[in-house]
From Swiss-Prot:
This is Probable Fe(2+)-trafficking protein. It comes from Burkholderia pseudomallei (strain 1710b). Keywords: Iron. Gene3D superfamilies: Fe(II) trafficking protein YggX. GO terms for biological process: cellular response to oxidative stress. The keyword Hydrolase does not apply.
């Protein structure tokens, strides 16, 4: 049976992650309050940020930037948007 949580991002009950997606306290916090769907949405956003900003994931500053963006996306005012990105129209 799937582990259900109240997703901090989606604001509803949803299937929780199978394991903490990141090490440390942030990973634990994500595991406890982020759904699989919200995590997949973040991975798409993260990929756009990496590509648009040409982040080198071997650079500790790039990794630190993404950790901050992850926390902002789920628990803050929202992560940075890729420049030039236009969300699809709802309808």
């Amino acid at each position: 049976m799937a582990r259900m949580i109240h997703c901090a991002k989606l604001g509803k009950e949803a299937e929780g992650l199978d394991f903490p997606p990141l090490p440390g306290e942030l990973g634990k916090r994500l595991y406890e309050s982020v759904s699989k769907q919200a995590w997949q949405d973040w991975l798409k956003q993260q990929t756009m940020l990496i590509n648009e900003n040409r982040l080198n994931m071997a650079d500790p500053r790039a990794r630190q930037y993404l950790m901050k963006q992850t926390e902002k996306y789920f628990f803050g005012e929202g992560a940075d948007q890729a420049s030039g990105y236009v969300p699809p129209a709802q309808g």
